[in-house]
UniProtKB/Swiss-Prot annotation:
Residues 1-20 have a biased composition (Basic and acidic residues). One of its GO terms (biological process) is protein folding. This is Protein GrpE. It is found in: Cytoplasm. Belongs to the GrpE family. GO terms for cellular component: cytosol. Participates actively in the response to hyperosmotic and heat shock by preventing the aggregation of stress-denatured proteins, in association with DnaK and GrpE. It is the nucleotide exchange factor for DnaK and may function as a thermosensor. Unfolded proteins bind initially to DnaJ; upon interaction with the DnaJ-bound protein, DnaK hydrolyzes its bound ATP, resulting in the formation of a stable complex. GrpE releases ADP from DnaK; ATP binding to DnaK triggers the release of the substrate protein, thus completing the reaction cycle. Keywords: Chaperone, Cytoplasm, Stress response. Residues 1-40 are annotated as: Disordered.
């Protein structure tokens, strides 16, 4: 070997380092083109995480909406319970009111000896009607109003020149509502056009 070909150990190490750098430089473009499988896995997991977070937000919104609906329904149920708690009692009081009105209709008002009793029945009826009005009970018993099937029950239709067609011309039995809800329809005679 010639002296030029022989290298010192330091030179050999330098040559090896340069060769290694060259190989790394050559290999670097190849590895840059090849995707690291860990990066793909990370991207996949991030996508799953994002999807799960969105589902969780949607579920939370649904749960909150359902809770609000349950709360509102409960409040409405309590309100209805308070508003219509007296419905059964009111229904039982209607025949009492009817009987007092019938007693006044059939009483002999010309008889002076019955005047005090008639006045007592009138005051009792007035007091009872005032008491039930305080709880939202209203009388349905007007005449000369248009027939309303929601609060009237037509018992008969009669021809009449004095009333417009389809108007209440006579109330046979008064009806009642409780806070706008029908307790009992008014039984009425309805006018129809004369032939």
């Amino acid at each position: 070997m010639s002296s030029k070909e022989q290298k010192t150990p330091d030179e050999q190490v330098l040559d090896q380092k340069e060769a290694a750098k060259g190989q790394q430089a050559d290999a670097a473009p190849e590895t840059a083109d090849v995707a690291d499988p860990r990066d793909a896995r990370i991207a996949e997991l991030e996508a799953q995480l994002s999807e799960l977070q969105q589902r969780e937000r949607d579920n939370m919104l649904r749960v909150r909406a359902e809770a609000d609906n349950v709360r509102r329904r409960a409040e409405m149920d309590v309100e209805k319970a308070h508003k219509f708690a007296v419905e059964k009692f009111a229904s039982e009081m209607l025949p009492v009111i009817d009987n007092l009105e019938r007693a006044l209709d059939t009483a002999d008002k010309a008889n002076e000896s019955l005047a005090a009793m008639i006045e007592g029945v009138e005051l009792t009826l007035k007091s009872l009607l005032d008491a039930v009005r305080k709880f939202g009970i209203e009388v349905v018993g007007d005449v000369n109003v248009p027939f309303n099937p929601e609060v009237h029950q037509a018992m008969t239709m009669l021809p009449s020149a004095d009333h417009q067609p389809n108007h209440v011309m006579m109330v046979m039995q008064k009806g009642y509502t409780l806070n706008g809800r029908l307790l009992r329809p008014a039984m009425v005679a309805v006018s129809k056009a004369q032939d």
